[in-house]
Amino acid sequence: MHEKGVRNLFLFEKVPDTFFRALPCLSRAVFLLFLSVLLIIPGINHSAEAECLTRGTGDLGIVIERASGSVQVVDTTARSSLFRIKGLGDLSHASAVFSRDARYAYIFGRDGGLSKIDLLCGSLVRRVVQAGNSIGGAISQDGSLVAVSNYTPGGVKIFDADSLEQVADLPASDDEGNLSKVVGLVDAPGQRFVYTLYDAGEIRSVDMRDPARPEVQRYRDIGRLPYDALITPDGRYYIAGLFGEDGLAMLDLWRPQKGVQRILDNYGKGEESLPVYKMPHLEGWAMAGRLAFLPAVGHHEVLVVDSDNWKEVGRIAVHGQPVFVEAQPGGRQVWVNFAHPLNDTVQVIDTQSLQVIHTFKPGKAVLHMEFSPRGEVVWISVRDDDVVQVYDTTRFTRLAELPAEKPSGIFFTARAHRTGL
């Protein structure tokens, strides 16, 4: 019997015998007929739970719709949309992480909102506005804690992943008490979060193994105005970009006693100074084997770096100023999108030959790319055309197109099992 029909049986148990005896025979027959109809029609909804999907979540994902404050839940196997969830606030610079069972997504909005959504029910579980202006977040190694980094008033707040109740508030102030914006928040091994203080020029690491007593380690004087950061896929290196000077600041999380080191001294040297909002995302770095591919600043180039010694080993000329440089799972290809006004184009680099092997134009304002877990397809958001497109990564053919309202970030549940994502 259909499970919803089984639930309907409980309706009979709740009707007292005295009620049946009080009914005339005809009325009693009509009432029993009505209950029988409820029993045999499984589609009748008696609870919100009855609307939820019964399926796995490993091939699900979300698409951020930045203009409407909504998110689409998508089926990446069928290449279709399952739900649209509304009421998520300002998603103009939104990002997301997933619970370790990949059922829930946590959406970090620009307005300070933290939203927990249910991917199987297509519903908003809870939303809290925890600050005035936030810029991303992370989920802990064991999936029990969600952290949010804030511009206003600064600092990091940490929440219980189940209830979204706050468990820690970590102010971001320097030694003189001046508040700082927080950027580059990531999860790290050892139940830690690592983040950067933009105004104070610090990297901080917080150990959350005992949520009641967070242990914060500070690394001062890393450089001027660190604007973004990343953690390498193995969880070892945390690297911050500097807006106020050239080069990068790197912390080896396996050997933190060595402190912060400077690498790639020429990184950041463009033909002209760029405003911080045009600086490339460091999360857009790609790792393919021991090679790291990263967007050059102010140049139409992708830099190639040997991660064994963090020395530059090559440059690849590309179509425009790179924004995201994304590695296909397996590392054979790197896909690149570009800043305005050349943001209608995507290029593909072969990581063996270090050559551009394909160039195409998905449409107006390509914002984000997300690969399927094994890399056979890539999803691309095209904001100004209001679509998400799906491409075969071998033949470079378009396989599907889904309508979306000003789509930006695309996030698949495979991220639930990867450090720093």
Predicted regions: what is each one?
Residues 3-22:
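N-terminal amphipathic/hydrophobic targeting modules at extreme N-termini
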Residues 9-10, 45-47:
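Glycine-centered signal
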Residues 13, 20-21, 39, 211, ...:
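Compositionally biased, intrinsically disordered/low-complexity regions enriched for serine, proline
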Residues 29-42:
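Bacterial N-terminal signal peptides
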Residues 46-421:
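Predominantly soluble domains enriched in secretory-pathway, periplasmic, or organellar proteins
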